[in-house]
């Protein structure tokens, strides 16, 4: 099977949306019956994003096999219907770690280890390894051309054209074409300079995708084509849109997929984008608008909750409801400032780590429980829902998590068993942590649902598979008293009986789960828990109008 590689680089500034562009292009090519995969190369020194603050990097997307990866992999999965694995994302730190381990073992037979060829060879090997079962491999290179961190990756993809043949490689450069409002003009000079930098590395882009506030007119595209040495048909205008789900159609309308298929000499059927038409239609046509509050501590960067926000939108599509998402800093609720919660039709508390903002989250859960507002807790959102119920309903004021208070007298949430340094008193001391990364319960795990429960009804099956990312879990030895007071466990892991789902029966909609259902939601299908949560929030609005 002939393998064709499409390398996507970025220029001028970061955060132009290379991940969305790669996912959208992948969706179009997948619709042409091509076997697609997408790889993200990240130029930072961290081995993976698992220990990076969400405020700096955005959410950590967990794959089925338990890899902690860049949030762009979430876009890839949602757009191309393909499950990503640990092979689909690697970093400079991961590559150097791999090379240094080999050097320590003596695999290089005493050679002097250098960026070229050892690091670049390792990068190429990882790319090729991930491409085994695909005939089109899209590779997104993080960062911006000109950054020193990206140089080994750029050199590696330059060499790929030499290794496998230039005819099997396309270089796409995504660049900014700014619109200067005071002059009323689009400026192409930054793009020209970015391409010049790319040429200095030895890479001639084949296609330019021009990100701009407005559509780049033909005469400007001709100018870019002339100065950047690409055909005018290969200069694609990608203007700002109000929905990322419009981008596949936007690229298709400019025949980007035709250009690529002709370049690779692929005789494949035209892309049918009907499913994307349906998504766009669902997004525009709704019968109701509701307000959902996400109570968190990383709200300075909305990307920290990217998959949760997308899953809420997907659920809105399925219910013909527009979801207005409000990101609320949990610390603002700590002084019982319930005024900011009054207009919410649903409250969601997502995953997180550490004790900052926990009081505000506990108060938000209490407010939702007592005022019959639909509540959805995810990961940490389940753990603190249990703590809130234990403290305020059961009356166990000492109930807490050892993550927040290692000395607590009633550790209803505690460290996962059988982990290194399992004592929470020791683990919470930084000097006693051998490695923080890779010490969690990660990836897809089976869960058994209780008969006659809401979760069983929504999933319509007894055994479900969902993705996890947590270091703490419910202490089964202390939970019986809480369960007897009315907080039902309706889902447990098959392997070790871990509490996975809780429900409160005397409430319109109160459900929380230890896993992360947002990672498997798609714009076409949504996710059963999110869909019913939004449905319930819609009912709440009608009841309180």
Swiss-Prot record:
E.C. code: 6.3.4.2
Binding-site residues, L-glutamine: 352, 380-383, 403, 471
UniProt xrefs under CDD domains: CTPS_N, GATase1_CTP_Synthase
Keywords noted in UniProt: ATP-binding, Glutamine amidotransferase, Ligase, Magnesium, Metal-binding, Nucleotide-binding, Pyrimidine biosynthesis
Binding site residues for ATP: 15-20, 72, 239-241
More info: CTPSs have evolved a hybrid strategy for distinguishing between UTP and CTP. The overlapping regions of the product feedback inhibitory and substrate sites recognize a common feature in both compounds, the triphosphate moiety. To differentiate isosteric substrate and product pyrimidine rings, an additional pocket far from the expected kinase/ligase catalytic site, specifically recognizes the cytosine and ribose portions of the product inhibitor.
Record's function text: Catalyzes the ATP-dependent amination of UTP to CTP with either L-glutamine or ammonia as the source of nitrogen. Regulates intracellular CTP levels through interactions with the four ribonucleotide triphosphates.
Designated name of the protein: CTP synthase
Native species: Buchnera aphidicola subsp. Acyrthosiphon pisum (strain 5A)
Taxonomic lineage from the root: Bacteria, Pseudomonadati, Pseudomonadota, Gammaproteobacteria, Enterobacterales
Gene this protein is translated from: pyrG
